[in-house]
């Protein structure tokens, strides 16, 4: 720590060092020279000396006032019963006074006095002795006054005792005299006592009277007594304030009391009167009950039998009298005076006085059974809360919902637990639960059935042509574009037995159809073209067959074409885990030609051989079960479904349940369009009579009761609808913030109408795959059947393009579409529809901007024109320099500025462009910082159409 000398301190104070040294000597700080060190204590002593010499002294506060204010809120019901918040403000003010005793003050003053010289010291000593003498005299006076006061108090006590003794003696004498003369002498004795008392008291008190003290001592005693009284009053007020503050704190911190009404005790019957309804007579010595509870007034017409039973009877007379005087009515709920309502009986049953307290109801915990889907309103009703509370809680959980929105079971159960209730998975009253037991027939014997074979492979590999040769028909020629777009089901009678074939599409769009075909089949024939080998849909067919765990027979087709490489096909199939039997695998390879018929018999033999190994059996004399292969809406026949019977026998007139649809079989056709009365296992047929178009891939079964079928179908449709809505809403909410972040996204709304369910499903899936981050395909509606006016109206509202796949619009729909400029597109080949939609989406993409360099120029000189500004005299080194083109200014191969060329001049003429090898003057727009040697790159921005 730095040491401060006297000279340095004087420099800080801007005073001469000699004057500071003299002041230090006066303050009692012994410093010989200006080089001596000063401590903090020396500076404090100097400061105290200067303050006392200037008369300021220590500026200590003798009185401190503290003010404290606290605000609290209490809730209290007003006259109308509503809770009101009242603000309570508590203010506390305390004053602290510092009291110094006179002797201590004198000692401090004496100690703090500086030593100046001997004469002054002598004078101060004399003053101190005088002060001490004065204090001694004051103490003696106070002691003398205290002794006089004590003597006076002693004399008063003795006089009081003497008076009490005299009074006691007089009372004793009066009692003795009263025994002989009871009336008259008593007055005389009393008078004697009164007369004797004044004589006795002065006799006793006279000797105790002390001599009067001096006036000075009396004044000092009065001052001391007054100070003591003030101190006592101050202490009393302080204690009262502290008690009040502590009481308020205790009241605010105390827990709120819940008033619980006591259950009234039933009066116990008196002993000896049990079993009787008569009022017992009061005993003669017993006091009256009315006297114990307060005598009843003559005006009271009813007496209170028991205070515990009722307290209202006692008030009846008072209420009636108040009503007669115009006061409160007896039926006004106990309210009288200004609290009673003015007008008639209306409002007389409102709440009582604000002092009425209702105990809060205890929270009720409910057991909520949550189904698979439930609306917000229904869930709120089950928990006995308002729907708004449920919506608030869902918002806290991050779900934006409406009152009619469907919630899935998991979300609803989490919400119920969050709101303090118990959630249970509801046991649904599901009609499907016992459906299998109703339909199952166990006492019917199993019989052999024909195998169901699915033909799969890549597009144009000859699947349908292979079936054509087997069926000796020309089915492939009838398909649009020569490709299969429907799943076909045929059964063929061969010399070796019956076989049912399912022909699936090979186009990539029909993945779901191929999966359904693999699900319904017993065997899979994988057709591979010898010239193409394994293709993407070939690999997919292999995966479907393995997923369905069905045997695979490979038919290598088109072996009659020149240039085929069978070994390459084998190696590619082995790479896909399809190993031929020749190499130790389990898949027979057959070389066939659908054109010449080569290998067809061998292929059928392999199919029947595999079927014998599988030992395929099914019940015949039982209700039919099977699979919906394809479904469509026919204009004349209504909903039509192609079904494959897997077990039992389907007859005309049976009640069929297929997914969420049902109906009675009105007509049944085979694959050739001929009517049929029944169909056994492994037979595909076309049925009519369903209420709606079923979903392809749904299972169907025959029920004995149409009412039960309708009930199950209705339940399934409602359940599917609720689940679909909940999933749609969840998808919307999840994608909402993503869509907001992406900005504006182009959408292409479409309405798809197809001839069959499978084609509509495949077309919709293919078009949805075309969606990109900038252009999205939105399928507004997709259904089976012709294009109707309702479809056109939906397209008008949603600004959608209508796509008809193998269907057409009726006359009314065409007229409405022409009048409202609705785009109608018809297709019969699926990849034509996909290509056109893809080109339409390409046109909706924003064009891509690319820079094209058109020329360069070198700045040779820089000159300033008065009206134009800074002009760059340049030489065009390559390409052309064009007016209004964009440029980049390079200085030492570093881009300095990028902008636009304002004008180009050649020989004082304003020109549009200057070619290579010519000099020109270039004026740059809004830029003048150019130097000799800079390079200009001139370019144009061109828009290039983008493709998907």
Swiss-Prot record:
Stretches for region G5: 593-595
Region (Disordered): 256-362
Source species, domain of life: Bacteria
Plastid listed as a keyword: no
InterPro entries assigned: DNA-bd_dom_put_sf, EF-G-like_DII, EFTu-like_2, IF2_assoc_dom_bac, IF2_II, IF2_N, P-loop_NTPase, Small_GTP-bd
Gene Ontology CC: cytosol
Compartments (UniProt record): Cytoplasm
GO MF terms, alphabetically ordered: GTP binding; GTPase activity; guanosine tetraphosphate binding; translation initiation factor activity
Residue span, tr-type G domain: 448-615
Biased composition (Low complexity): 282-297
Region (G1): 457-464
Keywords of this entry: Cytoplasm, GTP-binding, Initiation factor, Nucleotide-binding, Protein biosynthesis
Signal peptide interval: none
Pfam families: EF-G_D2, GTP_EFTU, GTP_EFTU_D2, IF-2, IF2_assoc, IF2_N
Chain coiled-coil ranges: none
Biased composition (Basic and acidic residues): 262-271, 298-308
Region feature (G3): 503-506
Similarity remark: Belongs to the TRAFAC class translation factor GTPase superfamily. Classic translation factor GTPase family. IF-2 subfamily.
Biological function: One of the essential components for the initiation of protein synthesis. Protects formylmethionyl-tRNA from spontaneous hydrolysis and promotes its binding to the 30S ribosomal subunits. Also involved in the hydrolysis of GTP during the formation of the 70S ribosomal complex.
Name the record gives this protein: Translation initiation factor IF-2
């Amino acid at each position: 720590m730095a040491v401060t000398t006297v000279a340095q301190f004087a420099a800080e104070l801007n005073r001469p060092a000699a004057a500071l040294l003299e002041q230090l000597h006066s303050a009692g700080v012994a410093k010989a020279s200006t080089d001596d060190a000063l401590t903090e204590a020396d500076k404090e002593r100097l400061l105290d000396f200067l303050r006392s010499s200037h008369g300021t002294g220590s500026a200590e506060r003798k009185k401190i006032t503290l003010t404290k204010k606290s605000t609290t809120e209490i809730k209290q019901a007003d006259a109308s019963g509503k809770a009101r918040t009242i603000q309570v403000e508590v203010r506390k003010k305390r004053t602290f006074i510092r009291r110094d005793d006179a002797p201590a003050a004198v000692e401090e003053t004496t100690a703090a006095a500086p030593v100046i010289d001997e004469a002054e010291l002598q004078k101060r000593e004399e003053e101190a002795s005088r002060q001490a003498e004065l204090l001694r005299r004051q103490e003696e006076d106070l002691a003398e006054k205290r002794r006089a006061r004590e003597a006076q108090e002693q004399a008063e006590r003795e006089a009081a005792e003497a008076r009490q003794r005299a009074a006691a003696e007089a009372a004793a004498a009066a009692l003795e005299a009263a025994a002989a003369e009871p009336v008259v002498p008593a007055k005389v004795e009393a008078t004697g006592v009164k007369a004797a008392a004044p004589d006795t008291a002065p006799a006793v008190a006279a000797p105790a009277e002390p001599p009067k003290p001096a006036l000075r001592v009396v004044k000092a005693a009065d001052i001391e007594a007054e100070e003591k009284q003030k101190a006592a009053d101050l202490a009393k007020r302080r204690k009262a304030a502290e008690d009040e503050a502590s009481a308020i704190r205790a009241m605010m911190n105390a827990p709120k009391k819940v008033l619980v009404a006591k259950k009234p005790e039933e009066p116990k019957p008196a002993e000896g009167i049990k079993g009787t309804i008569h009022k017992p007579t009061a005993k003669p010595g017993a006091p009256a009950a009315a006297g114990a509870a307060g005598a009843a007034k003559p005006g009271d017409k009813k007496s209170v039998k028991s205070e515990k039973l009722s307290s209202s009877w006692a008030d009846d007379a008072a209420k009636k009298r108040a009503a007669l005087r115009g006061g409160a009515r007896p039926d006004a709920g106990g309210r009288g005076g200004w609290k009673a309502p003015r007008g008639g009986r209306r409002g007389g049953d409102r709440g009582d006085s604000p002092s009425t307290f209702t105990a809060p109801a205890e929270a009720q915990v409910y057991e909520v059974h949550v189904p698979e889907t439930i609306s917000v309103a229904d869930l709120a009703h089950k928990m006995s809360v308002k729907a708004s509370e449920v919506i608030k809680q869902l918002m806290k959980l991050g779900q934006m919902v409406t009152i009619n929105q469907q919630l899935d079971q998991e979300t609803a159960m989490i919400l119920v637990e969050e709101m303090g209730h118990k959630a249970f998975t509801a046991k649904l009253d599901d009609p499907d639960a016992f459906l299998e037991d109703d339909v199952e027939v166990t006492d019917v014997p199993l019989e052999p059935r024909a195998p169901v074979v699915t033909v799969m492979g890549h597009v144009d590999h000859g699947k349908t042509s292979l079936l054509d040769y087997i069926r000796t028909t020309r089915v492939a020629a009838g398909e649009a574009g020569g490709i299969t777009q429907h799943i076909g089901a045929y059964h063929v009678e061969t010399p070796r037995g019956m076989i049912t074939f399912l022909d699936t599409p090979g186009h990539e769009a029909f993945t779901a159809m191929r999966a359904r075909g693999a699900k319904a089949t017993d065997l899979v024939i994988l057709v591979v073209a010898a010239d193409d080998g394994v293709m993407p849909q070939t690999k997919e067919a292999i995966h479907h067959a393995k997923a369905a765990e069905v045997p695979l027979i490979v038919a290598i087709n088109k072996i009659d074409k020149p240039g085929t490489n069978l070994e390459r096909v084998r190696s590619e199939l082995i790479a896909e885990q399809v190993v031929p039997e020749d190499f130790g695998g389990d898949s027979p390879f057959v070389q066939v030609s659908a054109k010449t018929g080569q290998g067809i018999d061998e292929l059928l033999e392999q199919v029947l051989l595999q079927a014998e190994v599988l030992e395929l059996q099914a019940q015949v004399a039982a209700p039919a079960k099977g699979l919906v292969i394809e479904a469509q809406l026919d204009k004349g026949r209504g909903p039509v479904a192609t079904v494959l019977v897997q077990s039992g026998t389907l007859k005309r007139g049976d009640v069929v349940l297929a997914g969420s649809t049902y109906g009675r079989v009105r007509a049944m056709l085979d694959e050739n369009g001929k009517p049929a009365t029944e169909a056994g296992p492994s037979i595909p047929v076309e049925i009519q009579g369903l209420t709606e178009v079923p979903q392809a891939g749904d299972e169907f079964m025959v029920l004995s009761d149409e009412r039960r079928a309708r009930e199950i179908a209705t339940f399934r449709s409602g359940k599917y609808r609720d689940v679909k809505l909940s999933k749609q809403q969840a998808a919307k909410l999840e994608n909402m913030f993503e869509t907001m972040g992406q900005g504006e996204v182009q959408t292409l709304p479409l309405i798809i109408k197809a001839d069959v369910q499978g084609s509509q499903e495949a077309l919709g899936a293919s078009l949805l795959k075309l969606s990109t981050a900038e252009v999205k395909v939105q399928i507004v509606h997709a259904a089976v059947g012709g294009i109707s006016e309702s479809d056109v109206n939906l397209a008008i509202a949603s600004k959608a393009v209508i796509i008809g796949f193998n269907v057409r619009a009726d006359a009314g729909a065409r007229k409405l579409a022409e009048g409202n400029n609705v785009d109608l597109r018809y297709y019969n080949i699926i990849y034509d529809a996909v290509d056109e939609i893809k080109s339409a989406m390409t046109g909706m993409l924003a064009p891509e901007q690319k820079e094209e360099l058109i020329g360069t120029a070198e700045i040779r000189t820089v000159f300033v024109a008065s009206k134009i500004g800074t002009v760059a005299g340049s030489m065009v080194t390559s390409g052309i320099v064009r007016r209004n083109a964009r440029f980049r200014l390079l200085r030492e191969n570093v881009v300095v500025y990028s902008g636009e060329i304002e004008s180009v001049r050649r020989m004082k003429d304003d020109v549009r462009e200057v070619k290579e090898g010519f000099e020109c003057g270039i004026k740059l727009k809004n830029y003048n910082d150019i130097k000799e040697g800079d390079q200009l790159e001139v370019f144009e921005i061109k828009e290039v159409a983008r493709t998907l």
